[in-house]
Amino acid sequence: MPTSPRRNSIATTDNVIGRNKSRKRPHSLGGPGALQELKEHTNPAKGILKSYSSFSVDPAFTGDEDFNDIHTQINNTVIGISSNVMAASKRLQMEDLQQLSRETSRKSLNRRVSFASHARVRWYPKDHQSDSEKSTSNHSTPERTFASDAKNHSPKGPTTTSFSRNETQSSPHSHSASIISDGSDMDIASPIRSTESDMVSEALNAGHPPPSLYPENDDLSIQNPTKALPEAEKALDVHDATREQVNDREETNMDLTIQFQEADSFLSHSESIKGLSSSEQGTVYSLKASHDPSNQTQLSSPNKSSSPTSIEISDFSKNNENHDQSENKEEEEDMMLTRPIEIPQHFSPIARPLTSQEAIVDMDITSNNINLSPVSHFSNGLDLQNLEEAPMNLTRPINANPHLTNHSPNDLTNGEEEMDTTSAFNIENSHLTLLSPIRPSSRSMEEQIMDLTQPISSTNAPTHLNEDDLNQFTSNISSSSKPRKDNNKTANSSKPIPDSEDFMDITRPFNILSPSKEALSEEQPMELTSTVFPCENSTSHLEVEEAAMDETVAFQIRGNNVELPSADKENAEREEIPSYSDKSENFNTTSFTNHERSPNGNNNLKFSKDPNSSSPSRHVVATPTDKLGTRKRRLRYSTSSFDQSTLRRNRLATIRNARKSISTLNDRELLPVNFFEKKVNSGLYKSVERSENYRLGATPLTAEKPFTTEKPLSSLPEEVSRQPTDDKGEQVSNADVDSGLSKTERLTIQQTNEIKHVPTNTTSSVKLPQQPSNEDEKERITTADYADSTSLERLESQEPNRNELVQVGSSNAGNTTSVGMNEHEKSPVKLSKGVSNVDTSLGASTINTNILNQDSGPNEEIPVGNEPEFDTMPTLPNVEPISLSDFLKMTGIEFLDNLTIAKRRETLLPNAEENKKCSIQELLESFYIQFPLLELYKFSCQQLQDYIAEGKDFVTKIEEETLKENPLLFYEYRKASSDMRVLMDSQFLMMKTFARLQAKGDWYEWREGLMQGIKHELNLNLTGMQRSLTHLMDVANVIHPYAQEIQERYNGSITTVQTLKKQKEFANQYDSTLLAQAQEKLEKLKVEVERRRRLLSEKEERRKELAIKIEQVTNSCSDLELRTNAEQDFYAKNQDFEFDEIKRYEEQLLNLKNELGWTIVSLTAGGIKLATNNTALSPYSAEVTVEILRQNFQVNVDIACKFPNESNACSSNVLEHVASSFSKWHSKVFSRNLRLLKKYLNDVSICWEQIVYLVQDFQRLWYHWPFLSVENDDKSIIINVELYLRSVSSKVKVVFGLPIDTIYQTTEVGKFYASTSVAVKQMYAESEGDSYVSEVLNTLSEVVHCTSTYALSSACLTVWNKYS
């Protein structure tokens, strides 16, 4: 099988981001958990939807430093991986991650986090700094370090804090540019400011400011907040005992996947929150505080001062981003949210400084930094222990300009850009009235990891607001000329919250400053795309990313209606809103700010007291449906009487419900609108707290009484600064407001189990106007110009009778202002249909909201009491369903069943004998080799066709089901933004790659089985052919001797047949009559030719005879001539001898020849040479010569044999053997005695005669039996004769042995036959038996031993004739 689908998925991710990076992720697509869970899901969209619900990609990253995080965020998007799989992997990785986080502690990670059902976390680094700003930040911002004691919560050494002005303040352009890439719904990675000291709280409780902090007349520039608050350090010791007691009572359900710092954990003790050094923070602060009658804190610019009390805030955010760009290489890890959050009974926002080691909080959110910013000054007159930190926007700091209200409209439009929902507030020409009392941290650039699975505890005892403080706070609000920008909630109620355990909502953002456990237990489900999480710089940046709303356009509230902005009205209102580039054309989020400038520059808010509310934190409105859902949820999640096993089961149920919330995409989500402020005094920061976060599928809270204002929000701040209003819209005094708030405080404790909210520090609530004040404001409610198709579809999909709830937050590095708009119960609230985007006049923040009302008109009142109760599970908007094929075309997924390819071209050269007819051999070979394969292929093709048919039927059924009921993935993909679609397409591409590789693996496995079958058949064929080859070789060995002759006969017959066929064809071409006449003439000619041929042959014979005769005569003439010449020579030589003398010598020689029997051949001085006269061996010529030497009578016998050309080879061989033996046997040396010589010559002559008879006998044998063989050795001559006995059908071999001694010594004829040995051997016979062999042997022996001449041939003939 090819490469794991995992490498293809990584390569796909690299293609998306434009880089090549081979880095493996532990939970990438293709892991064992993902594969198993993917197989279990029958719905194709199930599991995919979980991954795409809240993830987004930063499309504006440009630096190399962003690559790791972008690659991680895409590659770690897991489809359907369960929590236990991630937990197992987490345990193996987090130990190294903790060490890495400590080693890289000097890194400021401004990242944005988003949650999905499986609790994944994403980092979104920001890199939008110019070179000049980077250099300014790096050189002009020194570090600040704080030393603290972890045990006593008191600083050990001096703190070096440098507050200086930023040389170049950030403009709205820098804010918007820095946050273009931030599109997620949660942000928890940036610094959170902690409070300065408990001394401030004690001073405020006492009713007067600390003398060391607030001089009456002079401006104070605090360079070291730690020295400025010496007494505040001691106040922290009081809360140690309380903290330890609370921790003993709490059940800390820790996630064991990572080490947790129990003693000084960030989540366990809110006072452990620390700020970072100035090199890490985006803002450097210079504070000037003075006491004025209105107890008001103002933000002032170093160059422009509009009031004696000012706080200067210089933006070094781009410097911080420069540092992030170089440092931001941390890898993302999984977050396991399988444990509930333990909410403490008591909470105090006053933090203490910690050491560097204590500030490292090992929590299970993928190594994010919780960076804290310093607080430089506090004011008196407010109980800071009841102030709780707001959710903070950790993405950008605040650039404040206190002279915004004094500028002309033309000056404000120069720096206008689009709103950025993820950016911090850019506050100009306004004064912050509430400051967040957060203490700076002693850590510098240290990474903190927050674990949402840990309980939150606090050691500070609750401190409640009294009526004097509330009256003073209300008085300050009425006299303030600066806008309120913080959503603050009370930290604790008037009485302790019962200790109980809650199950956290993993899809819900976490409140950093430890809200009450019971309040968190009643939280509503959060919409995934509208989740708000604590943001940077301790600011509540409420980003509600709505999938069907426009994020880039803000809206305004006029009365109870929402109005879209226009360019001319925006310039007329002199608003400056930070730009925010829309990341997608589908995700449009409506947002607005809760401040608008009045023409005279005073921004005031009107608050209304609620007699039914006894707590300032009663800012969240609730509907009866919310009460019912809260009551059911409280009964479901309450753990006061449950055992530990029940708690675990409920935890798992919470995880499942959260995943359901993500998968179902509840579009009926409503967000609460909360406007609430804190009391502002000289040197005080405003603390921002998010009022409520909703999960998907939550039911909106209804208010007991509606908030009303007499004028729209455009003029709302001015009137609020003049006088707060009562429930009926009439102005009331500060005393009335204070009395109303005290009642609210008491009522909050009683209703804390019914209304689900996060407690914040508020003193009054803002009433929304029920009717717009003028027609111009009504006209601005229209949505025709700004609501896009996605927003309208989303608005139409919402259920009717839902109250508009908007949550507003603003962030600043070190001081925050939150203003909330509340809706009380049991009163109708007017909603405007189709509202998508409305701008506000003050560029303070961009708030995401949902305005969901389909049935009601633009200004139609919807009674709360008539609201229907909604189910816990949401319903999808009414959109036109699409088919599966259309969705697959949208995602680029295609099936391969309709592909057609051309036939493979022929790559071999054409054969010259293409039309040659196949022989039988070729046909048989093809049959035995290919036929089994063809059968197997036929079967395989049928199986494949069946599989394909089944697959098509299955796909058809799926198409019918999906068309009948579209999966949620179809809707989400069509409504997704371009960036989300890129991410989803990358996931689809990985799924396609995985499916393709898996299908290829299945195909190879199936094909392997097919090939095994083919191999088996081929092996069987090979075995059979090998057996046949062996048999054929055996047969060929037998037939081979006769094959050649048969082949020659066959070829001759073929030639004859062909010739006859040609003749027949030739004869058929002519007429038969003419042919007959021609044949007659031909016969006559043949006869004549034959006659003449005979005559010619006769003449030729005659000629030859005459030629022979002529030749003989010629030879005779030649001989005569030679003889004549010889005679003449002889005569010439012997002419001296007399004739008589010569005649006498001739007579003597003749007499000697007659006596000896030898002819004298020659006479020499040395001896004489004699030759025998026997010529009986005709046609052989064997002449025996004897040379007698004269000296010692040495006789050398030599036989000169001459054989004719046609002689028998066997006889010649016998004669040669006999002659050689005879010469050796008779060559002797005699003494000088002629008698002995004469006798010896006689014996030689007789012996030679015997040998002549023997040779003639050999010739007779050869004539009858040609296969005669003769062998000779030193003692005998062996003759082998093969006889075929026809009567007995057998063949015998007769062996004669003639002894040489007897042959050469016998002088009698035939005597040597008596000593001849005879043997008979049977060669083959039809029947077994030795009877005839013995008979043959006896017959041969008798004939040989009794015959004198020709005994051998006579004996063989006798036997042959006998058995013939």
From Swiss-Prot:
Q: Map out region (Disordered) in residue numbers.
A: 1-36, 124-190, 202-223, 289-334, 456-503, 564-643, 697-837
Give one GO term, molecular function aspect: kinetochore adaptor activity
User: Which one GO biological process term can you cite for this protein?
Assistant: cell division
Q: Where is the composition biased (Polar residues)?
A: 1-15, 157-169, 471-481, 586-617, 747-773, 808-820
Q: Where is the composition biased (Low complexity)?
A: 170-181, 300-310
Write one Pfam family the protein is assigned to. Answer: Knl1_RWD_C
Q: What name does UniProt use for this protein?
A: Outer kinetochore KNL1 complex subunit spc7
